[in-house]
């Protein structure tokens, strides 16, 4: 396993800092990634190659790009003509990535935002983004959820990214559940099947792996505000992978924090999921983060203090032969670290320490 970092709109200064942290593997999380677009709005393989070589100039490899799937899943239910247009652009993006030398693309299955209901004070006064189903309301959803690359609470802490990207391109097609038109379980699975049918054959031919981020968070039975999260359990992840069970192009951005959110026993659940999906060789990258709490009641936290035994997770990745990257994700917010660079530095160091303490 290797230490990785994901960065939105990286600058020369920020990449220099990453190399000083000891990072050798980069994920660019920009969505949409304007630097890669051609005149038609699709990625240009030559621009991807240039970005890859730019990253390599800092001594790092560009392992993964974020594929902006826009609102294709929701559109496949409510606006099929627009879904077809997005699918056409995605096929071009996938081929361009292959042409530019980047062969893993991560993407998110969210149709609505990454639902949160507020903040909980944590260690030393930091604030951790939280989801407590009992406190859910459409108003808290709009105010506290992640929208695309936006981070909740950034307006209070001067974060380096938008506080609320809702309604902007950076929301990458995610909408308020109240304005989604609703998503039943059957519609959710139909949308995912549509996506897989539209893009996996192109990815297979291009030699590109698509790494899906599960639904964050798991919703209660019956969903929230008319929306079901069907990939919110190990069973759901298994069913999703079985939409193309033999395809090496079809795998996971295994968000360990999101998987932990699916259970009242998050540590055991994470280990079980790593064993199953790592054993199937369908984990293509990892969001190595922790939470406090579990199903329907959790808050984000530093990786060393949560409910998941992170050392046990490392041992399990080792056992199943996972040899990809571990990326920190979703650290708390604080006025003392408005860009969260120090907090991500802490998470990187903690991850490096575990990798060294638990060798292959």
Which role does the model predict for each range below?
Residues 1, 127, 140-145, 224, ...:
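Generic structural motif recognizing short loop/turn segments at the entrances and edges of beta-strands
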Residues 1-45, 52-53:
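N-terminal basic, low-complexity leaders that serve as flexible interaction/assembly modules and, when applicable
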Residues 2-4, 9-11, 15-22, 56, ...:
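Histidine-acidic metal/acid-base catalytic patches
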Residues 29-193, 205, 258:
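Structural motif corresponding to the early beta-alpha repeats
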Residues 108, 214-215:
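Short, surface-exposed recognition loops or helix-turn segments adjacent to catalytic cores
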């Amino acid at each position: 396993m290797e230490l990785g970092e994901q960065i939105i709109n990286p600058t020369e200064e920020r990449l220099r800092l990453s190399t000083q942290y000891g990072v050798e593997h980069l994920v660019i999380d920009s969505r949409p990634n304007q630097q890669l677009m051609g005149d038609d709005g699709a990625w240009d393989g030559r621009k991807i190659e240039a970005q890859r070589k730019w990253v390599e100039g800092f001594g790092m490899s560009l392992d993964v790009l974020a594929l902006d799937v826009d609102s294709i899943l929701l559109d496949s239910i409510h606006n099929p003509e627009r879904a077809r247009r997005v699918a056409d652009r995605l096929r071009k993006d996938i081929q361009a990535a292959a042409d530019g030398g980047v062969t893993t693309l991560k993407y998110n299955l969210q149709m609505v935002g990454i639902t949160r209901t507020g903040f909980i004070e944590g260690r030393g006064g930091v604030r951790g983004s939280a989801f407590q189903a009992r406190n859910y309301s459409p108003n808290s959803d709009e105010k506290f959820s992640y929208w695309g690359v936006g981070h909740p609470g950034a307006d209070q802490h001067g974060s380096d990214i938008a506080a609320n990207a809702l309604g902007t391109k950076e929301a990458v097609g995610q909408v308020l559940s109240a304005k989604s038109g609703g998503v039943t379980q059957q519609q959710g699975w139909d949308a995912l099947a549509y996506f897989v049918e539209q893009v996996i054959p192109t990815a297979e031919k291009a030699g590109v792996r698509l790494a899906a981020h599960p639904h964050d968070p798991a919703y209660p039975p019956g969903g929230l505000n008319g929306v079901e999260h069907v990939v919110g359990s190990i069973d759901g992840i298994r069913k999703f992978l079985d939409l193309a069970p033999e395809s090496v192009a079809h795998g996971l951005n295994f968000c360990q924090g999101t998987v932990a959110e699916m259970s009242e026993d998050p540590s055991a659940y994470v280990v079980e999921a790593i064993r199953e999906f790592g054993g199937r060789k369908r984990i293509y990258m990892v969001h190595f983060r922790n939470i406090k709490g579990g199903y329907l009641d959790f808050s984000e936290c530093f990786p060393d203090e949560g409910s998941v035994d992170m050392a046990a997770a490392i041992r399990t990745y080792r056992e199943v032969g996972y040899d990809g990257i571990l990326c920190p994700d979703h650290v708390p917010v604080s006025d003392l670290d408005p860009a969260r660079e120090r907090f991500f530095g802490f998470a990187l160091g903690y991850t490096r320490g575990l990798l060294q303490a638990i060798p292959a």
